[in-house]
């Protein structure tokens, strides 16, 4: 099997990772592997897919492959805020209806994540702080 030698450049400027304790090095996958599912990439989408497969197919073997560190790329460089209000609500009836749909969807997404944190007993300092929007 060929070894991959060309990987995306990592400029090591992820500020969030810089404030975390050093993570243990995970050994490279070796030998022949057998899995029902292989997820490539451990960013938001890959982690969500692997987690969901584990929930929906608990007897299946899932392998998650990441070239670098989990959540270290673009997924780990966001601000991590979840807000339920759009930045610009608008003033027309159509814009207000769209904003209400957005608010319902956003609140459902926040609730989904809150439930996942509680169910997984994830220690992440989850806190509802509201939103301040000042001029």
Where are the regions that the model predicts?
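Short, flexible active-site-proximal loops enriched in glycine and acidic residues
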Residues: 71-79, 120-125
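Short coil-to-beta-strand
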Residues: 36, 75-90
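Dinucleotide-binding Rossmann-like beta1-alpha1 core, especially the glycine-rich loop
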Residues: 83-135
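Glycine-rich FAD pyrophosphate-binding loop
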Residues: 54-77
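Extreme N-terminal leader/targeting segments of oxidoreductases
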Residues: 1-37, 55-61
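A structure-centric signal for secondary-structure junctions around beta-strands
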Residues: 34, 59, 76, 128-129
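Glycine-rich Rossmann-fold phosphate-binding loop(s) that bind the pyrophosphate
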Residues: 37, 41-47, 67
